[in-house]
């Protein structure tokens, strides 16, 4: 199909008062000979029909809308038969720059030029298609796993639930009672896991395999092949998505020897106390005598960082619950809860108050200096910085250590993935399934595999059930999107995917190494890359990684960005008008710029902004093109990296930091100052301070001087 571009220039929302739309029309038709051009005071209202008519009657299949931000009116400017490129005249030109100023008009011209060139280079993506399975495998038969299985089955999916033990229930079978789930949230409740087990086993859409474990998982969303070993036999099934709910194991108490663990049998863990209460008696382990006094220590000091991360607020709630256990079993006892912090989120604050009302339960903030034995077999707990005084001692019969919940490792007991990047899931610092915790909590770094329960973060039974239901919804979404050949997240609905011009491939394998999601594999014969399409999240990290630029998308490529760079009009050096190219991450940085415009914060007119899918997609050659073209500086706006990363694609900013070394080498080769290329971390909430930071960067470039490459 021949490409036909239509440009639609809006003059509403103050656009026509700030810039000359006639001159914009001249850019479109005079410089690019656009065959269809229309103007309107509001294309977002009834005049949208003009665009629809041009698509239907004039054969327009590439639409350029010069109006408001691409983040608004997305439903209005969506045309199935055409690709759409938005020119952000309203927020990033009119609302953020002086009206009628020459540089404001120049910015509008360049914004339109870049959009037209992008439209020229864009192909309408064709979706990847395959035979998809409407089935889900859930690994783990605890509360999270069973809830996920029931949720997916209720949605119409066939579910296979795989549990390594001989019975369903997971760690919930070892819990005596659970925290309050019902108003007024004061009293402990029965666990009730047997009801969930019966519901799971009786559901017509669920097949339960106990004493079973996955031997291998291969394939991609929509069509995973799972090999399951059960009762000595291997069974192969095809599913569309996977839910991982393999649970947790107690934190290793040998790391808590400083609190007397292993020194005295009367120093036990909270797991041991749970078992005691479930058995019906709480006695002193050393001699079987009753408890007159006990202390529960929340191991939450600076030296207990790992235990804190594995316990979170759950350890605090368990301490409250177990204090009630001891008081119920030993009514004349006194229980001390020793803490540094106390966290009881949400409705659990009512439960906290209920425990405080018990005169036999005493709370003291403090730090345990030493635990020793007295001559009667009891324990002496020496406290510092306590509410009882600078130095204090507690005489107790039993010391309970609050240990955390360590996630079961996915590699050894959960998945056994047949992926180039390894058998297990990429994990966070403390062993939980890695994900963008705020935006995509259930999505692991293996597309189509969703984590639920304590493999994702520490949580109680109620939260685990909620987690399982949420993971089931994500699994169903994955199956639906995969069947349409569309990305699941974060670029939901994106039909594009990477293609490779293998004739130029150097077989370095960098694309497969840097892909955050294991979407690129290598052929065993030639070591050339190929994409496992439905694993791909369309971030373009592979495109940024390739040293010979052989990777592209139908609607995003190195050639497209290079053409957009060349479309910008660079003033002659004696004009003293700097031009700074900005690559802005579309997930945080670009919305922050947008918000600055909405709030009428002035931005430097010298910036020429190109949104990118992720900073990880920025190839070093793009920087070289910018400086060779005569840009005075390059600014890359991206997300926070590190353990607390905020990148939607995990490590885009981190990868770019490495590639910046190549950019600086390019600058040295061009005899340019390295300060001309900078990376700036931006959160969406930074819109208030971002204009000042940008102005500071522009001023620093002016101080260095304009690029000597202008005019070459």
Segments (PLM) and residue ranges:
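Residues forming the flavin
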Residues: 1-530, 534-578, 587-590, 602-615, ...
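Long, charged, low-complexity intrinsically disordered regions
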Residues: 580-582
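Eukaryotic N-terminal intrinsically disordered, low-complexity regulatory regions
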Residues: 592-595
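Thiamine diphosphate
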Residues: 618-627
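Divalent-metal-activated hydrolytic enzyme cores
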Residues: 674-712
């Amino acid at each position: 199909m021949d490409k036909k571009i239509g440009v639609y220039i809006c003059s509403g929302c103050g656009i026509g008062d700030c810039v000359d739309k006639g001159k914009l029309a001249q850019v479109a038709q005079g410089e690019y000979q656009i065959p269809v051009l229309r103007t309107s005071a509001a294309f977002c209202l009834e005049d949208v029909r003009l665009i629809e008519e041009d698509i239907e009657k004039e054969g327009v299949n590439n639409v350029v809308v010069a109006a408001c931000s691409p983040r608004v009116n997305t439903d209005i400017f969506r045309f199935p038969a055409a690709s759409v490129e938005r020119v952000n005249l309203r927020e990033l030109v009119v609302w953020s720059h002086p009206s009628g100023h020459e540089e404001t008009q120049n910015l509008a011209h360049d914004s339109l030029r870049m959009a037209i060139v992008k439209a020229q280079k864009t192909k309408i993506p064709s979706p990847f298609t395959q035979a998809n399975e409407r089935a889900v495998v859930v690994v783990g038969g605890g509360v999270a796993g069973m809830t996920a299985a029931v949720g997916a089955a209720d949605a119409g999916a066939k579910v296979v639930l795989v549990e390594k033990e001989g019975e369903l229930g997971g760690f919930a079978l070892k819990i005596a009672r659970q925290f309050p789930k019902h108003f007024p949230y004061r009293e402990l409740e029965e666990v009730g896991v047997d009801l969930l087990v019966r519901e799971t086993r009786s559901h017509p859409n669920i097949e339960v395999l106990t004493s079973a474990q996955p031997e291998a998982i291969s394939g991609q969303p929509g069509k995973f092949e799972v090999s399951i070993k059960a009762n000595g036999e291997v069974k192969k099934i095809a599913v569309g998505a996977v839910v991982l709910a393999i649970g947790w194991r107690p934190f290793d108490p040998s790391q808590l020897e400083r609190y007397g663990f292993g020194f005295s049998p009367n120093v036990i863990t909270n797991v041991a106390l749970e078992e005691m209460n479930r058995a019906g008696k709480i006695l002193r382990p050393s001699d079987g005598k009753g408890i007159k006094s006990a202390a529960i220590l929340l191991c939450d000091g600076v030296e207990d960082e790992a235990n804190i991360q594995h316990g979170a607020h759950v350890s605090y709630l368990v301490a409250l619950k177990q204090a009630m256990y001891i008081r119920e079993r030993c009514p004349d006892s006194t229980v001390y809860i020793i803490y540094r912090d106390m966290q009881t989120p949400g409705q659990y604050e009512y439960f906290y108050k209920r425990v405080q009302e018990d005169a036999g339960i005493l709370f003291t903030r403090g730090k345990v200096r030493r635990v020793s034995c007295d001559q009667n077999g009891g324990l002496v707990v020496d406290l510092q910085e306590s509410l009882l005084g600078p130095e204090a001692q507690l005489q107790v019969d039993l010391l309970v250590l609050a240990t955390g919940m360590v996630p079961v490792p996915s590699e050894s007991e959960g998945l056994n993935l047949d992926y180039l990047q390894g058998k297990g899931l990429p994990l966070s610092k403390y062993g939980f399934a890695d994900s963008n915790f705020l935006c995509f909590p259930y999505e692991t770094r293996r597309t189509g595999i969703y984590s639920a329960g304590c493999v994702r973060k520490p949580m109680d039974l109620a939260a685990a059930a909620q987690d399982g239901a949420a993971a089931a919804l994500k699994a169903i979404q994955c199956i639906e999107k995969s069947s349409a050949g569309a990305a699941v997240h974060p670029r939901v609905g994106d039909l594009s995917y990477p293609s490779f011009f293998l004739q130029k491939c150097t077989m370095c394998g960098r694309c497969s190494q840097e892909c955050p999601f294991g979407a690129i594999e290598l052929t065993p014969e030639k070591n050339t890359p190929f994409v496992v399409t439905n694993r791909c999240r369309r971030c373009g990290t592979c495109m940024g990684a390739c040293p010979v630029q052989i990777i592209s998308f139908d609607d995003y490529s190195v050639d497209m960005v290079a053409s957009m760079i060349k479309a910008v009009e660079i003033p002659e050096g004696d004009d003293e008008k700097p031009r700074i190219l900005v690559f802005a991450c579309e997930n945080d940085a670009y919305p922050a710029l947008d918000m600055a415009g909405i709030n009428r914060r002035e931005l430097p007119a010298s910036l020429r902004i190109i949104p990118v899918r992720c900073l990880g997609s920025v190839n070093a050659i793009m920087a070289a093109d910018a400086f060779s073209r005569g840009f005075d500086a390059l600014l890359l706006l991206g997300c926070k990296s590190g353990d607390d990363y905020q990148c939607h694609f995990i490590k885009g900013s981190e990868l770019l930091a490495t590639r910046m070394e190549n950019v600086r080498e390019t600058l040295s080769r061009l005899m340019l100052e390295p300060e001309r290329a900078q990376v700036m971390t931006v959160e969406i909430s930074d819109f208030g301070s971002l204009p000042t930071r940008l102005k500071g960067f522009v001023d620093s470039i002016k101080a260095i001087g304009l690029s000597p490459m202008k005019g070459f």
